[in-house]
Regions:
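Central cavity-lining transmembrane alpha-helices of secondary-active solute carriers
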Residues: 1-13
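Intracellular juxtamembrane helix-capping segments at the cytosolic ends
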Residues: 60-75
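A membrane-interface helix-boundary motif in multi-pass transporters
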Residues: 17-21, 105-128
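C-terminal membrane-cytosol helix-exit motif in multi-pass small-molecule transporters
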Residues: 127-147
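Glycine-rich segments within core transmembrane alpha-helices of 12-TM secondary carriers
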Residues: 1-4, 80-106
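Transmembrane alpha-helix termini and helix-breaking/packing motifs in multi-pass membrane transporters
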Residues: 9-12, 36, 40, 96-117
């Protein structure tokens, strides 16, 4: 999430935001499934660490693409409604991530008698949820934008201009250092 200001120009210039959203959901789903597969291993920690890092990176990428897509696709009124819905689900995700997941794993542990199996089943279930979400978004997300040029010199120029405009904003150096 820290590198979003540097990563977002690439998302904006390479491929469509719709394809980034769907692709990142598929990648997160794959990572969750791989976490489920590696939990029973003795050296699960290093594998899950890599997959969680990929999930964090993919999540930030999807967030950038989703922000861009709703700005392109929705009217100002609909954008306000979308932000309200998005914030509601963000809060629900925090509650779910902090409590419901642990309750489910506890229930699965009681059911199976094996904590590793319970966590694996949970991550497989989350993976299926992301695959269903990706399929749903493939069907319903609007195709409102054109694919951008993959000309490397043009991409570099756009990236440079975006970064330059970011760092030329008033008080950006103070904000960056104090953060």
């Amino acid at each position: 999430w820290v590198i979003k200001p540097f990563w977002s120009p690439i998302i904006d210039t390479v491929n469509t935001k719709r394809s980034w959203i769907i692709g990142m959901q598929l990648l997160i789903g794959c990572c969750l499934a791989l976490i489920g597969l590696t939990i029973p291993l003795e050296s699960f920690f290093k594998y899950t660490l890599v997959f969680f890092w990929l999930i964090a990176f993919s999540s930030a990428t999807q967030d950038i693409a989703a922000d861009g897509l709703y700005l392109l696709s929705l009217s100002s009124h609909d954008q306000a409604w979308y932000i309200g819905i998005r914030n509601t689900f963000y809060r629900l995700a925090i509650i779910t991530g902090q409590g419901l997941i642990i309750i489910i794993v506890g229930y699965l542990t009681d059911l199976t008698g094996q904590i590793y199996l319970a966590w694996s089943l949970l991550f497989f279930s989350l993976s299926v949820t992301l695959f269903i979400s990706a399929f749903y978004h493939y069907k319903v997300l609007p195709k409102t934008e054109q694919k951008r040029s993959n000309n490397s010199s043009q991409l570099f120029q756009e990236f440079y201009l975006i970064l330059k405009s970011f760092f030329l904003k008033p008080s950006i150096s103070i904000s960056t250092v104090s953060y």
